[in-house]
């Protein structure tokens, strides 16, 4: 069983972000544009902050790719932080560069600041917030873009967009996921409903005027996944659990749904389960309330995953906190931030879902080279057609 794994490293205002991916087969055609396209998408969206005017993320391959193809060895991706020019002393690894009086001691509610300084025995929340920052997601988007390229070569698509923002819901009557995605790519709020988009923009503008922030819900659709990815035989091999884990690992995500999600708990069984029919030479379901996953496995229908993102906790009208040294009351520190990052979160959600789907495909059809993976997938597809 082939296994795909990765690590990311780097601080928000450090020199760079780095990701190392192991397990990607050889001979996948790949270029920097495949990665940079999604890095640019992550930086777009109505409500983003000033950092996006500084960073223009570009990836650099430093291992694992030669002449436009993967080698089968670990792939290293590096993304330079342009803002490092302004932070060289503040984030220096050299002890002699220490500057007195720069410690952040007013932890921000809703962030990792206070718990982090307690856990890691720090006296400066800067040492926590630099790594806990959502800037880290740029590295995961790069890994996800690589996985999306792998999946595309196997006939699969991973499409992310915004279904709700600041309490404004997009009209879900549009059922064509490719059309939803195409429309959302033209939207500053990354949504497919033009009327809802205008109300979302107004909500973001109001929040900015009030020094507040907004959250929302993103949806990811996976199209073209074969039957039988994942497994029911152990809890940690259930693909729905792994997708939920991946989505919940995104900074500021507080809830995940697959298919009907929580609505399934409000309906009788007759309105939840997808009836099975046989048409032509295949089994079909006329509904997809399960969201493409039954028993922890893909059933051949589109996989539909949604994630709820809370409002960004850095507010320009700061919430109450205390100085963790003196215990005196203060307003929370204001770090440069977004009013709303939900449109960007849809791209991050795409990435983490793509990583899990690539892992599941390699577990089922893995090989050392893309040619072998495709042969295994084709043989399995022929078996499914005969069943």
From Swiss-Prot:
GO molecular function: chorismate synthase activity; FMN binding
Catalytic activity: 5-O-(1-carboxyvinyl)-3-phosphoshikimate = chorismate + phosphate
Keyword Lipid biosynthesis: no
Coiled coil (residue ranges): none
UniProt keyword Flavoprotein present: yes
InterPro entries (alphabetical): Chorismate_synth, Chorismate_synth_AroC_sf, Chorismate_synthase_CS
Binding note for cofactor: Reduced FMN (FMNH(2)).
PANTHER family: CHORISMATE SYNTHASE
Intrachain disulfide bonds: none
Broad class of enzyme this protein falls into: lyase
Protein name: Chorismate synthase
Function: This reaction introduces a second double bond into the aromatic ring system.
GO cellular component: cytosol
Species per Swiss-Prot/TrEMBL record: Syntrophotalea carbinolica (strain DSM 2380 / NBRC 103641 / GraBd1) (Pelobacter carbinolicus)
């Amino acid at each position: 069983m082939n296994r795909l794994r990765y690590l990311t490293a780097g601080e928000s205002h450090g020199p760079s972000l780095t990701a190392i991916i192991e397990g990607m087969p050889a001979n996948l055609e790949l270029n920097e544009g495949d990665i940079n396209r999604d890095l640019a998408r992550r930086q777009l969206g109505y409500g983003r902050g000033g950092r996006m005017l500084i960073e223009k993320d570009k990836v650099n391959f430093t291992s694992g790719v030669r002449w436009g193809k993967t080698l089968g060895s670990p792939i290293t991706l590096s993304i330079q932080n342009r803002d490092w020019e302004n932070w060289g002393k503040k984030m220096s690894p050299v002890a002699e560069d220490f500057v007195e009086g720069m410690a952040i001691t007013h932890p921000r509610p809703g962030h990792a600041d206070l718990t982090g300084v307690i856990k890691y025995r720090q006296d400066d929340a800067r040492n926590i917030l630099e790594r806990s920052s959502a800037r880290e997601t740029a590295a995961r988007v790069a890994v996800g873009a690589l996985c999306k390229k792998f999946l595309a070569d196997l006939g699969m698509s991973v499409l992310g967009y915004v279904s709700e923002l600041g309490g404004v819901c997009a009209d879900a009557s549009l059922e064509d996921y490719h059309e939803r995605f195409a429309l959302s790519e033209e939207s500053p709020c990354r949504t497919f409903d033009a009327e809802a988009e205008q109300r979302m923009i107004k909500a973001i503008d109001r929040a900015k005027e009030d020094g507040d922030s907004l959250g929302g819900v993103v949806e990811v659709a996976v199209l073209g996944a074969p039957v039988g990815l994942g497994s029911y035989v152990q809890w940690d091999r259930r693909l729905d659990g792994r997708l939920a884990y991946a989505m919940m690992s995104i900074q500021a995500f507080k809830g995940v749904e697959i298919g009907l999600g929580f609505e399934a708990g409000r309906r009788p069984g007759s309105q939840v389960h997808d009836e099975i029919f046989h048409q032509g030479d295949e089994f079909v379901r006329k509904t997809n309330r399960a969201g493409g996953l039954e028993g922890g496995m893909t059933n051949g229908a589109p996989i539909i995953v949604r994630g709820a993102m809370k409002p960004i906790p850095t507010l320009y009208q700061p919430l109450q906190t205390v100085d963790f040294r003196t215990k005196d009351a203060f307003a929370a520190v204001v770090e440069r931030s977004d009013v709303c990052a939900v449109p960007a979160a849809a791209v991050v959600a795409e990435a983490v879902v793509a990583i899990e789907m690539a892992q599941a495909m390699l577990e089922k059809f893995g090989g050392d080279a893309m040619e072998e993976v495709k042969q295994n997938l084709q043989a399995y597809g022929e078996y499914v057609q005969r069943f």
